[in-house]
C-alpha cells in the first residue's frame, strides 16, 4: 500500500500525536517514515533592531532557534522509536510550510503525507489548520489528517 510517509511536525501536542499515528501506520505497513520540520522565513521587525537581537547578534539567535528545532525533531524521533520505527529527519527553512511539505514529499517520493489537524496555531474544533488546508488543496499525494 504505502511505502514512504512524510509526517510534518512543529513540536505541538497535535503534531506529536500525528507522529505517533504515522509511526504505528508505518510499522504495520512496513513503510519508511520521514519526519519534516519547516521554519518559515524569519523577518526582523524594526522595533527589534537595537533590542535583544542586536545585543545577542543575529547568528547567536539563529543558533538558538536551530538548537530548539533539533530538539523538536529529536523528540519526534523518540516517539517513532517507541513505536519501533527508525525514522529519517529533514529540516527546511525559508519556505511556507505547506509548499515545503509538498515539495519534500515529492522529492523524497513519499506516497502519503501525515499531518495534524492543527499545529501551534491552535484553534480546535471543526476547522482545519491553515497549513493543513493548504496542503490538502495543493497536493495530489494522499493526506492523512490526525485529530
Where are these regions (language model features)?
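Short hydrophobic/aromatic patches at helix-to-coil boundaries
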Residues: 143-147
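Small/aliphatic-rich secondary-structure junction motif
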Residues: 3-56, 79-88
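Structural beta-alpha unit
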Residues: 78-113
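Short, well-ordered secondary-structure micro-motifs
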Residues: 18, 45-48, 99-102, 125-127
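Glycine-rich, Arg-bearing micro-motifs that act as flexible, cationic patches
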Residues: 112-137
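A short acidic, glycine-rich active-site loop
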Residues: 55-71
